Swiss-Prot record:
UniProt keyword terms in alphabetical order: Iron
UniProt xrefs under InterPro entries: Fe_traffick_prot_YggX, Fe_traffick_prot_YggX_sf
Biological processes annotated in GO: cellular response to oxidative stress
Cysteines joined through disulfide linkages: none
Function noted in UniProt: Could be a mediator in iron transactions between iron acquisition and iron-requiring processes, such as synthesis and/or repair of Fe-S clusters in biosynthetic enzymes.
GO cellular component: cytosol
Family: Belongs to the Fe(2+)-trafficking protein family.
Name of the protein in its database record: Probable Fe(2+)-trafficking protein
UniProt source species: Stenotrophomonas maltophilia (strain R551-3)
Source lineage: Bacteria, Pseudomonadati, Pseudomonadota, Gammaproteobacteria, Lysobacterales
Gene Ontology molecular function: iron ion binding
Keyword Iron: yes
């Protein structure tokens, strides 16, 4: 049986995640307040950020940047596309 959460990203009840997707308090906050569709949207946005900015998840500075963007994207609705990003047709 799936969990239901009030998704802060979508501002509606949504199917909750099956597991805590990120370590620490932030991971628990995501698990309690973000739905599966919103998490999938974040993963797509994160992939775009990594590719467009040539980030490496191994680099501590890049991980810190991605974590900040994660919070902006899921909880603050303040995430932006990378400078010069143009989606493929």
């Amino acid at each position: 049986m799936s969990r239901t959460v009030f998704c802060q990203y979508e501002q509606r009840d949504a199917e909750g995640l099956d597991f805590v997707p990120y370590p620490g308090e932030l991971g628990q906050r995501i698990f309690n307040n973000i739905g599966k569709q919103a998490w999938a949207a974040w993963l797509a946005h994160q992939t775009m950020l990594i590719n467009e900015n040539r980030l490496s998840p191994r680099t501590p500075e890049h991980r810190a940047f991605l974590e900040g963007e994660l919070v902006k994207f899921l909880f603050e609705k303040d995430a932006e596309k990378p400078a010069g990003f143009t989606p493929e047709a």
